[in-house]
Every structure is written in C-alpha cells, then in structure tokens.
Amino acid sequence: MSLRQYFVERDPFTSRAFFPVFSKEDLTGPEGVERLVAVRNTEEIMGVALNTAFPDVEARYKAFMGRLTRPEKRLNVVGLGDVGGTLVTALKLLGDDIREIGIYDPNESLCRRYEMELNQVLDREKPVIRILDEAELFDCDAFLFTASRGVPPLGAAGDVRMLQFEKNRDMLKTYTKKAREACFSGLFCQISDPVDQLSRCVFLQSNRDENGTYDFAGLLPEQVAGFGLGVMKARAAYMARRMGVNPSTLRAYGPHGAGLVIANSPTEYDSDLSDELTRLTASANREVRALGFKPYIAPAISSAALSILALLRGEDFHGAIPMGGVYFGCVSKMTPAGTVVRAEALHPELETRIQKAWAELKEGEASCRT
C-alpha cells in the first residue's frame, strides 16, 4: 500500500514519529489525550505524516511497517518467570499466525523446559519455540520484555507495581542499549511493571548516544508499546458483572495502577459507579494475593498475549501508546500509517478524569530520564 507522505517537524520528546493523515487538520492536530475525543472519519487514510525531527524517519518508518506487515512473524520473549511462562504458553495456543517464538532467560533450565514442553503440544506445529542466544535477542519482529527485579512479596503494602520501578528501569538499560546497537526495527513490547512509565524509559534510553545526549536515533516512539491495560478492562468487566452492571459499555484508560480510569460508559457517565468500578479494578490483584497467590495469569493472557496479538493483526487493542510525552493506556489499532486511537464523544466529567490521569503521568516523567 503506497501512501502519500507529508513531512512535519515536531518536538521529538512529545510528538510521534509518524501518524495517519485523514485530513489536512491532522498535520497540525494535538498529540495528547485530546486525540481521544477528536472524532472524525477514519475509514480512508489520505497519507502518512513523517516527523523529520527523527533522523532517517522515512527509512525507519518503512522498516518498522515491513516488520509488522509480514504474514508470519517471529517473536522473542525475555523472561520466563510467572508472567513470561504463561505468556509463551498462551502465544503457543493462540498464535497460529506466529512462525516462531524465541525464548531467553538467565535460567537455562527454564528455557529448556519451555522449549521441550511447548514443542510437544499436540497438533500445534506453529509457532515453533526456540531457545535464543543473547546475540539473537533483537533478530525478530517483536521483542517482548517480561523480566522483572524485586517483585514484591505477598503481603507487600502500597502500589506493588511502582515498587519495582527503579530496579526494572535500571535493568532495561542493558536491553535498550542492545536494541539501539542492533538498529532494531521491530516492536518493543514492555510488559513488566510499571508498564506505562517503563515504556517511556525504553523510548528515552534507546535514544541516547554514548555520551548520554539525546539524538533520537534509537527506537521511534511508535516502536514501543506498553501492555498492562488489557487486564484492567477484563477485571472491570468481572467486577461489573459481580455488581449486576452491564459490562458492554465499560471503558478503561490510563496507567496499569494508580491513576487508572474505569468508566461505566463514555457518554452516560456515572461518576460514583465509575469510581467504585475503578477502585475494585485497581485492587483486584490484592484479592488474589490475599488468597496466597501472585496474580499473574490474567495479566499474562489479557494484557500481554491477547493484546499483543491484536496489535500485530491490526485489530483494536488495549495498551499504552505515545501520547504527548507519556505512554498512556487506551484502545487503538495499528494501521499502515501508524496508530489510530478510538476517538469518541466523552462525558465532560470523564474527559476531565482522563486529562488528570494523563497530567499525573506527565508530572512523573522526569524519573524516566534518569
């Protein structure tokens, strides 16, 4: 598909590298959460806007789209802990259009176990599971990062996701450097917590040269996506059913944790009901922890496996995407010209809540630059 190209120059810290153009107004349109209410006809793409603030943006855009449009993709997964192991299992069962899943973990026995067991699943020849060497990590179409340091023990107080931030941010530096050195042109899927903040770290870390100067020659903002919102939507639906509320009109926005926004409806918004749904959804993981288990099955399947496959297939997915200098959770889909968010009319109170959640992420963005 050949698209007309429009060249723009925007601040690379807060803007997209490429995006679909449906009308000339898009060339000067907003970058933040205002996009969620910018309702317009998105049936026919007029072209693609390329941001020249990113070096060689045209070639990098084409390389990325070349990866995403391959009929059978190769995925590499780093980290075979609770989430990673469940994710690989789900991808094996659901990924008919995935050719190969590469797996990597410092624990070689874990790698051997998953390679043996998942390649012995009856009548599931694809995807093939293969153990990776470290040098092969970024030889793929999508890189899935689930590794985590310092997962809080059962009974830990506070937002257990944010307790992992500094250790996981520092661990990521090794991998973002490798992605930069490999000139990685695929999709970097950030799965370990806190998803939204770490997605921003991935983008920023990869775009520093050896002197620490930002040159924006690493990953494009669209090459990074965070996967934590899917399970929040699923948990909200579960809680709604328990309350006798129809889950079909539910909406989920924002981060996977503090700042999450669950709405009972985009237009028939009930603030009290939505606040209660948000509270129950945000604390759902603690219900599982109270039973003596770590809550990793639903996140690995809903936030990671199903959402990543939906993105790769060009379907609507729940995930954190670049939005005005942060990675913000919403429903969007990947097109040949870039990401299109689900824009719709929103109740004014809901719009205010979303703006507040975005502003809180923006306030904490400085910690992503360390």
Task: Give, region by region, the residue ranges found by the protein language model.
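Glycine/serine-rich phosphate-binding loop and adjoining beta1-alpha1 elements at the start
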Residues: 1-74, 104
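Rossmann-fold NAD(P)-binding glycine/threonine-rich loop
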Residues: 2-14, 153-217
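Long, compositionally biased stretches enriched for glycine and/or charged residues
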Residues: 8-30, 240-370
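Conserved beta-strand elements of the Class I
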Residues: 76-78, 189
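Hydrophobic/small residue at the entry helix of a nucleotide-binding pocket
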Residues: 83-86
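Conserved S-adenosyl-L-methionine
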Residues: 93-100
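Conserved N-terminal Rossmann-fold NAD(P) cofactor-binding segment
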Residues: 100, 104-140, 149-152
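Rossmann-like dinucleotide-binding core of oxidoreductases
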Residues: 192-267
